[in-house]
Structure formats: structure tokens, C-alpha cells
Amino acid sequence: PCRNLIFLSYALGLAESIYLKSKKKSEIFVGFKCEGTESYPDTTKEFVSAMNKLGRVSCTTDFTVKAPLIKKDKEDIILLGKKLGINFIKTFSCYIGKKKHCGYCLACKLRQEGFNWANEKDPTKYINSIADDKI
């Protein structure tokens, strides 16, 4: 709960620190995506707007949080990644925090479904295979 608020608070603090040292303004990019009708409250356009407002009132310069994928679902992102030549082995989705994807958490399930919906082979090595399980 509220983990994106915590992550972005750290990112704003880091961006502020970089700005104070180098006078280089930073933009903060997040990978929020659409989950159909089930968006998490801290991955919405309203949340991004609120974080931008928080940055304006709490930092010495105006930082912008950007969410370029916010209207795309996993399938769209995987197809875009393929088009851009992304090595999906180097991407990570799992919530559990191990070195490998667990295969059971919601993020792992959505990752597998995204590759399935995009008709792409999932190159991910999962600790637990849930190929027959559904979300």
C-alpha cells in the first residue's frame, strides 16, 4: 500500500539533491500502466498530478513526474518493447523481491498474461511455473 508514494517521495528528494548540486532540473519517469478497469490508486493520472503538485510545493524547483505508459496495458507495452528492441530478460516485474520472478504474485501473473495477449514468447525464468493457472 502506498508504495508509489514512497518511491516518488524518494525520487523527488534525489532530484532535489541533484538540482542543488548541479543546477540541472530533472524529470522523473514512472512506468505506471493501465490495468483495464482495475487501476491501483497510486498509478492513476490523478496520482501523477498530485505528485507533481507535491513537488511544486515541497521542492525549490519544479520537477515533473511523467508517466508515458499510463494509457497502455501490458500487451501494448510488450509490443512496444519488442518494436524498440528491448531485452525482456533484463526487465523485472515481481513483487516478492527475489533475484528471479516468483511466478505466483499478481505482477508475475500479469507479466505472463501480457506476453500471452501479445502472442509473444515469455523469456522470463520463473521460480514457480503457473502456465496452467489463470489470473
Tell me what each language-model feature is.
Residues 1-135:
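Nucleotide-activated chemistry modules centered on ATP-dependent adenylation/adenylyltransferase
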